[in-house]
């Protein structure tokens, strides 16, 4: 380990430990990373001593660079580590791995000068964008050469179809991946799709319809002289009756070029758009925001469906103003209507941020509790009665405090009449209750008794005694009681008579 760690020593080792592994990360390079890189070089047949100099690191990078795009994670990590070591040897100040990679690529292009050493006639150049695509057709030595699509492009297209399931993203993805392709390359992309053969059949039908329309609009002229390039037909544009060389000549000829690649791409885009409508049958007017769904996710779903809609820009603009607001939930709709006429999407997203979340629910709950605990308006009579109600002290007779809070001397005797010997609860001058003074000594009354002041005599004549009214129920009860008493007396037999009868039975047993 000591020999391998001596690749960088002293000041260079200190500079290595200042470089971060990732931009903005906390971890930094250490000597163990150099030891690991030296061990990995054996797998590629490279000597460890190459890491000790700038030129040696450059040789390692020239070997590893072509393998990085399709290499494993270990290969990419080895390439990054060697880039950092190269920067240390070259005394380039770098802060992290990505910056070291950029510095290495910039210096290697300048030092090698591979582009300058090539002759101008054989240097790959792309044709102007106005005359067709720039890939995979390239101009080498004054002639246009066809380069097949890379496996990475085909793999990206297949993954796009498998993951998105013919969503709205497939159309734009196809446009990006098929830029500058010939009909031969586009057919190769379509043939790579193994699944979704129903969608592929729909695309073929659209291609046949468009090819038939092309033949009607561009009829073929009569017989041409030998060696002259014919005009493309619908099947030629679809790549079924034409070769790659003919397609390139139609695209890049000097007089009357025909971009057969772009025409074929347009036909396939029509088929893809039809597949998108078939695989996404949801109408944009049916997309509504859920009661607990954030407004941002609702807008994402809305615009994703709008992207799949094939409508005029004016209709799409109307959809972004009217249905977007109408299909929002009541909380967001209340906020959006307060923004005025034709608010922008940024204003709507900013205004509805946090609507339906915990913060808004807490505010609504606080407002509801505040309204619930706030006393309502009292009736007029109750308000007057409540305003007249005051506290009166029994000790001093003043208002505003109770007897317990009174600071005046304690008054002796009854607080009602002021006489000693009894309390206010037993005061004879208190107001008579509904049942009279109480049950002691006499039965309770069911009417209030008026107190007759002493010294006053009644002036009305006394009532004459009269017989009580006859109650038939009382007479019947009295007769039953007398009858029962007689029956009890008749059933009673003296004990002496019973014992005598028992004694006389002894003669039966002799």
Swiss-Prot record:
GO terms for molecular function: RNA binding; structural molecule activity; zinc ion binding. The keyword Zinc-finger applies. A lipid is attached at residue 2 (N-myristoyl glycine). One of its GO terms (cellular component) is membrane. Capsid protein p24 is phosphorylated. Specific enzymatic cleavages by the viral protease yield mature proteins. The polyprotein is cleaved during and after budding, this process is termed maturation. One of its GO terms (biological process) is viral budding via host ESCRT complex. Keywords: Capsid protein, Host cell membrane, Host cytoplasm, Host membrane, Host nucleus, Host-virus interaction, Lipoprotein, Membrane, Metal-binding, Myristate, Phosphoprotein, Repeat, RNA-binding, Viral budding, Viral budding via the host ESCRT complexes, Viral nucleoprotein, Viral release from host cell, Virion, Zinc, Zinc-finger. A zinc finger (CCHC-type) spans 391-408, 412-429. SUPFAM superfamilies: Retroviral matrix proteins, Retrovirus capsid dimerization domain-like, Retrovirus capsid protein, N-terminal core domain, Retrovirus zinc finger-like domains. A motif (PTAP/PSAP motif) lies at residues 458-461. A motif (Nuclear localization signal) lies at residues 26-32. InterPro entries: Gag_p24_C (IPR045345), Lentvrl_matrix_N (IPR000071), Matrix_HIV/RSV_N (IPR012344), Primate_lentivir_Gag_pol-like (IPR050195), Retrov_capsid_C (IPR008916), Retrov_capsid_N (IPR008919), Retrovr_matrix (IPR010999), Znf_CCHC (IPR001878). Residues 492-505 are annotated as: Interaction with host ALIX. The record marks 135-136, 447-448 as: Cleavage. A motif (Nuclear export signal) lies at residues 16-22. Residues 219-238 are annotated as: Disordered. Matrix protein p17 targets Gag and Gag-Pol polyproteins to the plasma membrane via a multipartite membrane binding signal, that includes its myristoylated N-terminus. Also mediates nuclear localization of the preintegration complex. Implicated in the release from host cell mediated by Vpu. Belongs to the primate lentivirus group gag polyprotein family. Late-budding domains (L domains) are short sequence motifs essential for viral particle budding. They recruit proteins of the host ESCRT machinery (Endosomal Sorting Complex Required for Transport) or ESCRT-associated proteins. p6-gag contains two L domains: a PTAP/PSAP motif, which interacts with the UEV domain of TSG101 and an ALIX binding motif. This is a macaque isolate. This is Gag polyprotein. It comes from Simian immunodeficiency virus (isolate STM) (SIV-mac). The lineage of its organism: Viruses, Riboviria, Pararnavirae, Artverviricota, Revtraviricetes. The gene is gag.
């Amino acid at each position: 380990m000591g020999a391998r760690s001596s690749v960088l020593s002293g000041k260079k080792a200190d500079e290595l430990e200042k470089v971060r592994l990732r931009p903005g990360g906390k971890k930094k390079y250490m000597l163990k990373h150099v030891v690991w890189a030296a061990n990995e070089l054996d797998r590629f047949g490279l000597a460890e001593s190459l890491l000790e100099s700038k030129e040696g690191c450059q040789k390692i990078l020239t070997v590893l660079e072509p393998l990085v795009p399709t290499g494993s994670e270990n290969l990419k990590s080895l390439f990054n580590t060697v880039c950092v070591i190269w920067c240390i040897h070259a005394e380039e100040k770098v802060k992290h791995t990505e910056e070291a990679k950029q510095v290495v690529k910039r210096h290697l292009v300048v030092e090698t000068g591979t582009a300058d050493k090539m002759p101008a006639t054989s240097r790959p150049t792309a044709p102007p964008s106005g005359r067709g695509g720039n890939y995979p057709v390239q101009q080498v030595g004054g002639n246009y050469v066809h380069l097949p699509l890379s496996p990475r492009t085909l793999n990206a297209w297949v993954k796009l179809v498998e993951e998105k399931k013919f969503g709205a993203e497939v159309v734009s993805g196809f446009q990006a991946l098929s830029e500058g392709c010939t009909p031969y390359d586009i057919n190769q992309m379509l043939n790579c799709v193994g699944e979704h053969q129903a969608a592929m059949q729909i695309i073929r039908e659209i291609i046949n319809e468009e090819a038939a329309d092309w033949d009607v609009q561009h009829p073929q002229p009569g017989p041409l002289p030998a060696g002259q390039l014919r005009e493309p037909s619908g099947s030629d544009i679809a790549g079924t009756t034409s070769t790659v060389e003919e397609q390139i000549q139609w695209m890049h000829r000097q007089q009357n070029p025909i971009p057969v690649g772009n025409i074929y791409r347009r036909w396939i885009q029509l088929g893809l758009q039809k597949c998108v409508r078939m695989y996404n049958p949801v109408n944009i007017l049916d997309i509504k925001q859920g009661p607990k769904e954030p407004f941002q996710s609702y807008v994402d779903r809305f615009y994703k469906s709008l992207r799949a809609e094939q409508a005029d820009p004016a209709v799409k603009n109307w959809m972004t103003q009217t249905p977007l607001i109408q299909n929002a939930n009541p909380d967001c709709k209340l906020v959006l209507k307060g923004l005025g006429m034709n608010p922008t999407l940024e204003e709507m997203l900013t205004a509805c941020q946090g609507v339906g979340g915990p913060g808004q629910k807490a505010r609504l709950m606080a407002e509801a509790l505040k309204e619930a605990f706030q006393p309502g308006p009292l009736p007029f009579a109750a308000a007057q009665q409540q305003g007249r109600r005051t506290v009166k002290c029994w000790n001093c007779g003043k208002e505003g405090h109770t007897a317990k809070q009174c600071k005046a001397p304690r008054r002796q005797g009854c607080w009602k009449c002021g006489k000693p010997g009894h309390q206010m609860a037993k005061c004879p001058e208190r107001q008579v209750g509904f049942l009279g003074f109480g049950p002691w000594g006499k039965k309770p009354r069911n009417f209030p008794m008026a107190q007759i002041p002493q010294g006053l005599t009644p002036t009305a004549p006394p009532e004459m005694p009269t017989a009580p009214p006859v109650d038939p129920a009382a007479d019947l009860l009295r007769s039953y009681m007398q009858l029962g008493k007689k029956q009890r007396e008749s059933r009673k037999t003296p004990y002496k008579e019973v014992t005598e009868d028992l004694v006389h039975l002894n003669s039966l047993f002799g």
